[in-house]
Structures are given as structure tokens and as C-alpha cells.
């Protein structure tokens, strides 16, 4: 019986470096995620995990190194003011393949939930409005807030806002979902409803990179766990190995709290 074919690489980071002022936040990060991988990215505050995630869609531009999405490497150029993307249109195209969910929801407060979800598909991707509305309504039902379609974000709980943000990201039909601490701004009783949606996305086979403090999610849902410490990947592997037989003393201390 032949082995299953290896899944294509969805995201590849090679020797990524990033400095803010005199502080080197990423010190040569290399990481690979294949299609269908769920990668949980762990680390203490200031370890570089959110910066690494934000470099994937160029919200932060790395000083050096390569970011490759679905086989296409983002071209960078050195300028007197630092490193910049060489082709903004390339960045826009690659961003359209990446759904981003932020810690602070980042919904547009002057738009209803439905308007938030259809904004990018209609006005950025140029898809027919009626088609986008139908898809948005299905996504809102999918994340359990179909009854909130005409509400404004201020009238939603934090958990409902984050589920709306997930629907908004999915509406762009991304190849990869990026989550930057999606539950850390939520009241404890609201965390579960967001994690349930994320778990169901993983079960669909979606490619996900998740910066998180939720150890249960990392242990039970991920197929790869990455631990960053001071801008370096200290530990990486499947959760059953990382959580039970870690080679990193720092990671064991991190787990012990």
C-alpha cells in the first residue's frame, strides 16, 4: 500500500528577522505549515509570536527572510526607510488568500454585522452583492449568530463580535486562517463559544495558524505546536510529543506557569 501523497505547503517562513528599534523580536524564524495543518503558536508575552503571524500578511514587514504563501514568495526590497514589499499588488493578492482574526475583533463599528461580512467580498474582491449576502448569511448561521445579522457590533457580546469577525474572514474564501490571540480579550465564560467555532473549522480541514494561550485547544485540536521564546522557536512538534516529552526546559517552565 503506497503512502498518502504529501500535502502541499500552505505557508513557509524562512529565516525571518524583525527588529523594532534596538530590540530584535524575530531572530531567524523558519516554519512550515501544510494544507490542513492546525498550528498552535505558544509563548510568553513579548516572545514574538504575534509579530511572526503579522509578518505573514505583511502587517509587519520583516527586515529579512522569506514569506511564501501557496508557493508564492513575497518580494521585498531594501529602501532608505527600511524593508518594504516590492509590489503592493502582490501583497494585496496574497492577503486575499489569508483570513485574519484579531484579538480585538476589529469590526467596523458603523456597519451592521452583515455589512461587515460582505464588505471585502463586494468592494475588494468585486463579487456580486446578492451572492455575497447569501454566503454571509450562511456563514453567520455557521458561527451561530444568524439572528444578529442586522445588529451593530456595540450591541453584541465579545464572543459574538469575535464570531462575526471569524465569519468576516471566512467570507473572503481564504486558503489559510490566521488567528492572533482570538480569545484573550474575552470574558472567561465567552471563550468556549469561539473555541467551538475554531474547532469545527479545524475539523473541516482548514489550514489554521493560531497564536493562543488556550492549552486545551493546542493539545486537542492542533497537529503541530510551536513554542517561541525571545524570538526563537524553542520547541516544535506534534502536541502529543511537545506536551508530554518536551526537550525544552523553558517550555516545561512555561507550561508550569
Where are these regions (language model features)?
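ABC family nucleotide-binding domain
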Residues: 8-239
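C-terminal boundary and immediately downstream tail of ABC-type ATPase nucleotide-binding domains
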Residues: 227-230, 234, 240-257
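Short, low-complexity, intrinsically disordered N-terminal peptides in bacterial proteins
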Residues: 1-7
